[in-house]
């Protein structure tokens, strides 16, 4: 499961920052701790970088970040020092979690159940507020009198398996029974503060505050009927009547308004459908989703919900190796959303993805929406032209993207494949090294940069001289980062 980890070895625990003086964890220490945790999550088989879902999530995350800056909730120091990255996990459980250093984790299971964009924004605003309010540092300071090893327990807690009903998750999981009760009590205060601060971000960021109440209603219903471990968010974020009442009282009318924009949009329905399918629900569930458009109740659904059903049926058919069925449902989807620009774009991307999965690269290229400057188009087009032998078409867009997004590991992977296809092994090796560096695996990055140096020494091409100098410079920089990383152990 995404976020699972085995206990840290004694050497790793001993190398964590100590809290003997009871002082707050500094922002630099918290960032380093977060980087260590995130390095393990990048290696987790459930980690997924899906460009379509990732772009949709970023479209929520960035306005929330801007609102936090504008309202003074996000200090310039934290803004500069923390990572502010969102990671996705394939896990089907409904969960989200904040990590040290400005990292946020979202399970596809949660994205798959949120009813509106505003509901997803409410979860992300809440988690963002856990970070901006320095809850991790505050809690560790409170607990440091009991045991400095609590920081090690916090690392384990942040990575605890979400499918384990006995694990108290999210920000902190105490490793010792003595500390547990105080942690839970403090957590309630944190939850209320994150609710209040997070809700204050919603309207300035362009989201309806009613999304908080809608999400709370959904969680409350799940709390009543579901106790099978699939909603760990309820354990890590205890839902109390006080929290619900507090959020309702903060709405202008004390409840949902008739003019609330919290309605289902086709784009959102399609993204949540994608999240459900990519969470690997199993063959039987996929078959149910594929059959749903033929059910008697499909015609009575609102158009936006129909779009989600058709998207799941098309992508599910593709995963079941039914290319004809995938094309049929994708065609119906495109017809349904033809007057909705955002949904039409997603439908075209899906059609291209399905054609590529069916091994018809020319059809995939023809199905692509115009332009390749946006990340989903750029990465999918790269996969397609690598099949058609036209990889030079994407070299420029990839290089332009990486110039402004140097930590995009997936883009570096695509760049490596493109350079290999064009017979430029030195550039490919450098790109492979950058993949590891972007995921904080500096040891592996150093190995690839050194391999690049060896390759450059054997090269007789004058064009490789410039690339070799880049490799030398990057190797020195990454070796320095590796030494810092080793010193923390």
Regions found by a protein language model. Give the residues of each.
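Extracytoplasmic and endomembrane cell-envelope/extracellular-matrix remodeling and assembly machinery
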Residues: 20-21, 47, 55, 70-73, ...
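Short alpha-helical catalytic segment bearing the HExxH-like zincin motif
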Residues: 105, 119-127, 131, 173, ...
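Acidic/histidine metal-binding catalytic segments
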Residues: 140-152, 167-170, 206-216
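Catalytic Zn2+-binding segment of zinc metalloproteases
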Residues: 115-119, 128-145, 163
């Amino acid at each position: 499961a995404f976020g699972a980890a085995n206990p840290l070895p004694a050497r790793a625990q001993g190398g964590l920052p100590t809290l003997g003086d009871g002082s707050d964890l500094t922002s630099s220490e918290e960032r380093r701790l977060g980087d260590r945790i995130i390095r393990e999550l990048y290696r987790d088989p459930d980690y997924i970088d899906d460009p379509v879902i990732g772009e949709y999530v970023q479209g929520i995350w960035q306005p929330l970040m801007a609102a936090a800056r504008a309202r003074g909730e996000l200090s310039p120091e934290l803004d500069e020092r923390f990572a502010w990255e969102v990671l996705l996990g394939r896990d089907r459980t409904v969960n989200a979690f904040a990590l040290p250093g400005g990292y946020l984790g979202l399970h596809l299971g949660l994205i798959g159940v949120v009813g509106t964009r505003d509901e997803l924004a409410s979860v992300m605003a809440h988690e963002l507020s856990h970070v901006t309010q320095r809850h991790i540092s505050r809690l560790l300071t409170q607990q440091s009198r009991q045991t400095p090893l609590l920081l090690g327990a916090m690392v384990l807690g942040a990575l605890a398996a979400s499918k384990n009903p006995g694990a108290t998750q999210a920000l902190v999981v105490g490793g010792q029974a003595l500390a547990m009760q105080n942690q839970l009590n403090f957590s309630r205060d944190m939850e209320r503060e994150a609710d209040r601060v997070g809700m204050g971000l919603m309207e300035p960021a362009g989201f309806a505050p009613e999304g908080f109440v809608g999400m709370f209603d959904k969680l409350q219903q799940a709390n009543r009927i579901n106790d099978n471990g699939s909603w760990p968010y309820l354990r890590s974020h205890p839902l109390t009547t006080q929290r619900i009442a507090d959020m309702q009282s903060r709405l202008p009318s004390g409840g949902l308004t008739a003019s609330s924009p919290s309605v289902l949009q086709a784009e959102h329905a399609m993204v949540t459908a994608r999240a459900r399918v990519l969470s690997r629900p199993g063959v039987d569930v996929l078959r149910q989703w594929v059959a749903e458009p033929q059910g008697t109740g499909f015609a009575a659904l609102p158009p936006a919900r129909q779009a989600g059903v058709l998207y799941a049926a098309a992508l599910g058919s593709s995963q079941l190796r039914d290319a004809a069925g995938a094309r049929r449902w994708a065609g119906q989807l495109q017809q349904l959303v033809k007057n909705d620009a955002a949904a039409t774009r997603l439908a075209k991307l899906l059609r291209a993805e399905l054609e590529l999965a069916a091994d018809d690269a020319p059809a995939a290229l023809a199905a692509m929406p115009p332009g390749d400057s946006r990340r989903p188009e750029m990465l999918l087009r790269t996969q397609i032209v690598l099949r058609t032998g036209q990889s030079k078409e994407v070299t420029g867009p990839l290089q332009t993207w990486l110039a402004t997004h140097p930590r995009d590991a997936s883009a570096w992977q695509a760049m490596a494949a493109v350079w290999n296809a064009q017979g430029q092994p030195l550039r490919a090796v450098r790109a492979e090294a950058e993949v590891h560096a972007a995921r904080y695996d500096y040891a592996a990055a150093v190995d690839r940069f050194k391999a690049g140096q060896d390759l450059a020494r054997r090269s007789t091409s004058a064009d490789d001289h410039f690339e070799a100098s880049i490799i030398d410079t990057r190797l020195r920089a990454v070796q320095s980062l590796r030494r810092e990383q080793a010193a923390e152990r």
